[in-house]
Amino acid sequence: MNEALRDLAGYIKEKLDGRVQDWMVAYDELTIFVEPGDIVDVLTFLKSDVQCQFFAFVDISGVDYPARERRFEVVYHLLSPRQNQRIRVKVSTDEETPIPSVIEVFPAANWYEREIYDLYGVLFTEHPDLRRILTDYGFEGHPLRKDFPLTGFVEVHYDDEAKRVVYQPVNLRQEFRNFDFLSPWEGTDYVLPGDEKAKQ
């Protein structure tokens, strides 16, 4: 394990006085885990502390783990050009518990938080404009949740006769098929065209 990252993790944990729930090093990057209510203070510290200087905001991403009690993980990626280090800050939440917006610390987080709200349904408090950014105005649900149907709920297409966009229920071309993935597949007994050389 990289000693510099271990030292950095110890320093951050000491300075943040109990706000870091856990930490780990994977792929030469430090990951720390914090509670939703502490995210603004933690990111402010990581950005402004002289030993850290993680002032380059890379992005925020969302992850859905349906089996967990707090199924959503919001992951903040920061870079310290002066320390030549990256850090990942993870916050877990559920469908009901909002996370404080970090726009005051990193203004570039605005659209990332809107994307996570749109695609996962994670709520951010004190966000100035928390509305959908990628899906259509009347879209129902959050498409990156694991429980969202693969086919969606409606099909959208432009109707040339009506000269407008039309929403229709999903029309699957094939009925639902239940595959038995546990049974072994033996293959065919006959030679397919083009496979004559394989039988010789």
Swiss-Prot record:
The keyword Transport applies. GO terms for cellular component: plasma membrane. The keyword Repeat does not apply. It is a peripheral membrane protein. It is found in: Cell inner membrane. It is an enzyme of class 7 (translocase). It catalyses: a quinone + NADH + 5 H(+)(in) = a quinol + NAD(+) + 4 H(+)(out). Pfam families: Complex1_30kDa (PF00329). GO terms for molecular function: NADH dehydrogenase (ubiquinone) activity; NADH:ubiquinone reductase (non-electrogenic) activity; quinone binding. It comes from the Bacteria. Its EC number is 7.1.1.-. PROSITE patterns: COMPLEX1_30K. Keywords: Cell inner membrane, Cell membrane, Membrane, NAD, Quinone, Translocase, Transport, Ubiquinone. NDH-1 shuttles electrons from NADH, via FMN and iron-sulfur (Fe-S) centers, to quinones in the respiratory chain. The immediate electron acceptor for the enzyme in this species is believed to be ubiquinone. Couples the redox reaction to proton translocation (for every two electrons transferred, four hydrogen ions are translocated across the cytoplasmic membrane), and thus conserves the redox energy in a proton gradient. NDH-1 is composed of 14 different subunits. Subunits NuoB, C, D, E, F, and G constitute the peripheral sector of the complex. Belongs to the complex I 30 kDa subunit family. This is NADH-quinone oxidoreductase subunit C. It comes from Chelativorans sp. (strain BNC1).
